[in-house]
Structures are given as structure tokens and as C-alpha cells.
Amino acid sequence: MAVTGTERVKRGMAEMQKGGVIMDVVNAEQAKIAEAAGAVAVMALERVPADIRAAGGVARMADPTVIEEVMKAVSIPVMAKARIGHYVEARVLEALGVDYIDESEVLTPADEEFHIDKRQFTVPFVCGCRDLGEAARRIAEGASMLRTKGEPGTGNIVEAVRHMRKVNAQVRKVVSMSEDELMTEAKNLGAPFEVLLEIKRLGRLPVVNFAAGGVATPADAALMMHLGADGVFVGSGIFKSENPEKYARAIVEATTHYEDYELIAHLSKGLGGAMKGIDISSLLPEQRMQERGW
């Protein structure tokens, strides 16, 4: 029998969300909308990434009251974010009973050198990555699910596309290498050799990799599935749109039926305005959340 909190169990829990949509919510009402639309999980926050970006300052773990309200409102899994390197925030979230913890670059990092040792927790962790080096380091630390970093709160899919393509291209390269070449590749990527060896033997990443950071429309979600995403996170794209209920349902349907272009065309009709987007080139270096983490 598998033991609660083992790597196998935690990875299996994340695998159960495959093919689905995970939505950011800030209260019980939004959580109910997400669940009714078919979300496989919700991410409980005080503010969606677009509002965190607009407010500036230091972004921290959400008030536990908000998280508990969301947990009571829905029957689907509830995730919550901890700051990069903030071990105590993660322990608090675990004590609250959340189903997953996202060690997230959307929040202001608490440690500029170390990420959380996720192997010490029974709850599974989600982490962002831009390339295979970051992905492998997070897996070695105990991450059970990955997601592209994209550029959160922008409604601009370009960075999520870049990150998904890069990770997948690097995975293909590793799979094609002989085992004696992997040590040099591990050095080049700053990645643990054992993780690359596992990727080579499996022919893929050992954990699921979702798309996140800039998904704003049904077509965006379908695009990321075409590029090899195992599922989709939608942060600001739902509740910053003109019609959250319609957008939520449409994005869930487009994620499931991402190869049915007639359906996606139908889903895209009459939705109202998508969230206002931001051109990535207009962001200052310190405004680029994807740069957080190492």
C-alpha cells in the first residue's frame, strides 16, 4: 500500500488533474463559479495576479480565512500559494489542509537563494519553470507538478508558449542522448543528473507540466494543449473578463476539446471582452515575475 505523502502518492495526486483547468479565485462565490464551470481545482488567493501586479509592494500568502472559505465552498481540490523559500508559509498552508501548495513567483520571494525542500511535506507542491534546468531542480526538491511561468497577470500568452516549447525541446534532446552524455548536459542545464536520467528512461518529464501565465481565451488554452501541456492554469483571465461564467465554461471546454476548431469557434462567440492585456516588452525587468526563482 502507498504511504500518504510519498513521492509516488503526491505525483499521482497531481496526475489526477491532467487534462483539466485550474482557476484562480479570491472568494467562495468565485470558487463556486469555477466548480460549476468544470474546473478540476481552484487556487485560493486574496488577489489575482493582475491585481498583485497593479498593487506592487510585497505580495504574501493569502489570509487563512480566505483559503478556508474557499475550501468550505467547493468539493474540488483547493490550492494556495506560498512565497518562494518561505518554509513557514508552506507549513501553515499544510496545516490548513489545502490539497496542493504552489511555491509561486507571483508572490514576492522570501529567499533569494533557496527554494523550499518540498520532500519534507506530505502535501504535493506545484512549481513554475521556464526551461528544463528549472524543471529538473524543482523535481529534485520534491515538486509533484510543474507549470510554465509565463508572465502572470498580463493576459499575454507569448511567454507561456516560449517556456512550454523550450522545456519540451530540451526533454526531446535529453531523451535522444546516450547515458554517458547526460552528465555534461546536467552540468550545462544546472540540473541533477538523476532527474535527467529518469527523464531519459521515461521518455518524458516524470511529473505533469501545466500551462500557466497569460492564458486569457479559449483559443489560448487550446494552443497550450496543442504544444503539449498536461492542463491549464488560468489566473486573471477568468475573473478579469467581462463575463467570468462564460469564459470559465468556454476555457474548460476548449481545453478538453482542443482539436475541435469548430467547437472552439462556437465557444469564442459572444463572450464579451477578454481581460485587458499587457505587452511584455513594456514591462521593466523588475516587473517580470518569471525572473523570480532560480
Swiss-Prot record:
The keyword Manganese does not apply. One of its GO terms (biological process) is amino acid metabolic process. The active site is at K81 (schiff-base intermediate with d-ribose 5-phosphate). Keywords: Lyase, Pyridoxal phosphate, Schiff base. D-ribose 5-phosphate binds at D24, G153, G214, G235, S236. D-glyceraldehyde 3-phosphate binds at R165. GO terms for molecular function: pyridoxal 5'-phosphate synthase (glutamine hydrolysing) activity. Its EC number is 4.3.3.6. It catalyses: aldehydo-D-ribose 5-phosphate + D-glyceraldehyde 3-phosphate + L-glutamine = pyridoxal 5'-phosphate + L-glutamate + phosphate + 3 H2O + H(+). The keyword Lyase applies. Belongs to the PdxS/SNZ family. This is Pyridoxal 5'-phosphate synthase subunit PdxS. The lineage of its organism: Bacteria, Bacillati, Bacillota, Bacilli, Bacillales.
